[in-house]
Amino acid sequence: RRQRQMCIRDSARWLPNENRRETWEETVNRYVDFMSLKVKGNLPIAQLKDSITNLEVMPSMRALMTAGLALERDNTAGYNCSYLPVDDPKSFDEAMYILLCGTGVGFSVERQFVSELPNVAEEFHETDTVIVVADSKLGWAKAFKELVAMLYHGQVPKWDLSKVRPAGAPLKTFGGRASGPEPLESLFRFTVEVFKNAHGRKLSSIECHDIVCKIAEIVVVGGVRRSALISLSNLSDDRMRAAKSGQWWVDNKQRALSNNSAAYTEKPDVGIFMDEWKALYDSKSGERGIFNRESAQKIVAKNGRRDPEHEFGTNPCSEIILRNREFCNLSEVVIRPTDDEESLKEKVELATILGTFQSTLVNFKYVSSTWRKNCEEER
């Protein structure tokens, strides 16, 4: 019963004409009906519906929530999670757009990535340019992209948020309610200050981390979905090691939005390893965790189905190995005490059908073509 309640809470859409939320059966039907319209050939539709309804197998919960017009408009909304490094100014607005689609973001602020960012201007000047923010996910992301581009050139624009619908207004296509203009105002002001403090140099790892966390903060306010983030950093990065030390929740509340992990690229010596664990203990936050990239590459090579020559990252739950700019295609088998070998084989087959269908959802509207390329190559 609790599982059904959680599924209804997270995935059922509001039916305004009937003044109620979908039932669990209606949610499942909407997903499977969307799937059947997209896939040619014979599918075990009735069996898929029964298995999802009875919580034997599960598709992507994001696809379950958005199946229909929202998912048709942009397939980004069909994926639970993603990963990208902050190696280009576009990383910021891509992360924003993906989070606004309800998809979690793993990101890296390791030095080999943030060192690829351009230098920030030496001086800043107020300009008469006004960024008019359109009232959509695309409008928000484009406006933030424009802001970041101008700040890199030392120009501080004005912005007009008058077209953004008020907080609490219903989002008819995507579901949920609007954040309102206030969180966006806060993000823009925060970003301006971070760039001004970085004048004449590149953004540091902690500055990039804070901008992404602040982006996630505005999505939480919207009530669309609680933003999920994981931030990877170098083992030797003292600033990121201390990101959640002291009273960080007073001066840097945005850091609560991300779990933090050190990316291990080789076996550290005992001294470095113990320093990291001492810092974890002293912080009382349980962070940083460990992401072993070297091990991830070895696992990929051992399985023999994927190209191991990538600097892999991971999703916020750290349950999947992802390329630079790739989405996590998730389907699940729910194992019960009553299962035997045959029933498990049947469940795995059905979950595979769901995952195969979801892998065809590569119509991404805003992000770079690399996302589609990676998803298609690893289908």
Regions found by a protein language model. Give the residues of each.
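Extended catalytic cores of very large enzyme megasubunits
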Residues: 1-379
